[in-house]
Each structure stands twice: as structure tokens, then as C-alpha cells.
Curated annotation (Swiss-Prot):
Function, in words: Component of the Mediator complex, a coactivator involved in the regulated transcription of nearly all RNA polymerase II-dependent genes. Mediator functions as a bridge to convey information from gene-specific regulatory proteins to the basal RNA polymerase II transcription machinery. Mediator is recruited to promoters by direct interactions with regulatory proteins and serves as a scaffold for the assembly of a functional preinitiation complex with RNA polymerase II and the general transcription factors.
A UniProt-annotated Pfam family: Med8
Keywords: Activator, Nucleus, Transcription, Transcription regulation
Positions of the UniProt region annotated as Disordered: 204-233
GO biological process: negative regulation of transcription by RNA polymerase II; positive regulation of transcription elongation by RNA polymerase II; positive regulation of transcription initiation by RNA polymerase II; RNA polymerase II preinitiation complex assembly
Subunit structure comment from the entry: Component of the Mediator complex.
Keyword Transmembrane helix annotated: no
Protein name: Mediator of RNA polymerase II transcription subunit 8
Organism field: Candida glabrata (strain ATCC 2001 / BCRC 20586 / JCM 3761 / NBRC 0622 / NRRL Y-65 / CBS 138) (Yeast)
Main location class: nucleus
Biased composition (Polar residues): 210-223
Lineage: Eukaryota, Fungi, Dikarya, Ascomycota, Saccharomycotina
Example of a GO MF term: RNA polymerase II cis-regulatory region sequence-specific DNA binding
Coiled coil: none
């Protein structure tokens, strides 16, 4: 029987006519771009020497634009994605891709999303158990209107910022203007005092000639005009 069942499985050809290919490809491309941008920001923030603020701001603006694109794409294909049911084919490698299969077949929200929903309900102060369905629909409609308004305002501000000249050339000019200027040896920060020299000065009122602390104190005195602070031998 097992051989017959295996032969039947081999003869069955999957029907991909109902798969929403364009919708899935569009969402996949938008998510891939957003993931790449988020990974780049994470790498920039993980460096020992932080990236210049204007470069980081430019990257964040790109990421926000891609996030808006993902949201718009999901809204455009909302009906198609909501009506799509995911199920594995007989040849799906369940052993090597168990986590992916579990994620696709999950019926409940992940714990993080459940926590977000709980926090949102508590922050809204709305008790859905004590309200009628039409009242809940009005609240959801009002929330959608507010979200749409906020998205439009953000899009206008983003376009305004782009039109004001935050281009690559402007950022390069700004970067050159913010580069550190070379200073003379006298203007550079002096080396810190040595603990031993500080203790000697506090106890005896003098420091050893030629020490780094002596040089630092002498330089500071010359700059301030007060040369009587250090006691002579």
C-alpha cells in the first residue's frame, strides 16, 4: 500500500493557479529592501566610531520611505493576502524548514504582537467586552482616519525635506564643513597629570623637573599668564 500511495503522491501535480504570485513578490521585494536598510543602520550603530549624524539621518529617511512602501503594498493587497491559505505540499522539507513551516501555519499572533495589542487596548481605555459591535466599528473607523491623516502628514514632511536639498551633494558639502581642523602643538590637549607628581606637589609644593606634569603646568601657566603657581626649587 505504501508503494501505491507513494506513486499517487508522485502523480499529483500541485496547482499554482491560485497562488497570488504578484502580491507575494511585491511584498517580498519591499521587505527585503527594508531588512537591508535596517541591517545597515544596525551595523552603523554597532561601530566603535559612530557614523556622521547627517549620513545616519539620510539612511533613516530612506528606511522610513521603505517602511511606508511596505505599508502601502500590504494595504494594496490586503484582500488577497487575507483570503490566502498557506499549507505545505507533500514534498516540503519539514525537517530542515520546520521553523518556517511553523511560522506560516501559526494561527495565533506571536507573543510580541499579542503584547502590542494588549498595550494598545489598555492605552485606548476601551473595554470591548462592554461595547456593541457597531460602537467598536466606529472606533476602528476613527482610528483608521487618524492613521491615514498621520501618514499623509508624514509623507508631506518627507517630501518637503527631500525638496529642501538633503541630497548626496549637500551631505558631502556638510561633511567637508564638519571635518576637524588641524591645530598647532600648543593648542592640542595636554597629557594628563601623573598621580605621583600630583601627590609630590601637594605634600612638598614642588614637582620633578622634566616630568609630564611639569610640562603641562608650565604650558597652562604660560597660556593663563600666571607663572607664580609652581614653586621653584
Amino acid at each position: 500500500m505504501s508503494g501505491i500511495n507513494g506513486a499517487l503522491v508522485e502523480d499529483i501535480k500541485p496547482d499554482y493557479s491560485g497562488v497570488p504570485g504578484p502580491a507575494l513578490d511585491s511584498v517580498r521585494m519591499r521587505l527585503a529592501q527594508l531588512t537591508h536598510s535596517l541591517r545597515r543602520i544596525r551595523d552603523d550603530l554597532s561601530r566603535a566610531d559612530l557614523t556622521q549624524w547627517y549620513s545616519l539621518q539620510s539612511q533613516i529617511n530612506v528606511t522610513l520611505s521603505q517602511l511606508m512602501s511596505v505599508t502601502s503594498t500590504l494595504q494594496h493587497f490586503e484582500d488577497t493576502l487575507d483570503s490566502t491559505i498557506v499549507y505545505p505540499l507533500p514534498k516540503f522539507p519539514t525537517t530542515s524548514h520546520e521553523s518556517l513551516l511553523t511560522t506560516l501555519l501559526r494561527k495565533k499572533n506571536i507573543p510580541e504582537v499579542e503584547e502590542w495589542i494588549k498595550d494598545a487596548i489598555e492605552a485606548s481605555g476601551v473595554d470591548t467586552n462592554m461595547m456593541r459591535d457597531d460602537e467598536i466599528e466606529k472606533i476602528l473607523e476613527k482610528n483608521n482616519e487618524d492613521s491615514k491623516w498621520a501618514l499623509e502628514v508624514f509623507a508631506k514632511e518627507f517630501e518637503k525635506r527631500e525638496s529642501n536639498g538633503d541630497t548626496a551633494d549637500d551631505l558631502d558639502v556638510l561633511g567637508n564643513a564638519l571635518k576637524p581642523v588641524k591645530t598647532s602643538v600648543r593648542q592640542r590637549a595636554q597629557s594628563p597629570f601623573q598621580v605621583e607628581d600630583v601627590l609630590k606637589y601637594m605634600s612638598r609644593g614642588e614637582v620633578d623637573r622634566g616630568s609630564s606634569s611639569q610640562e603641562g603646568l608650565s604650558t597652562n601657566n604660560e597660556q593663563s599668564g600666571d607663572k607664580d603657581i609652581i614653586m621653584a626649587d
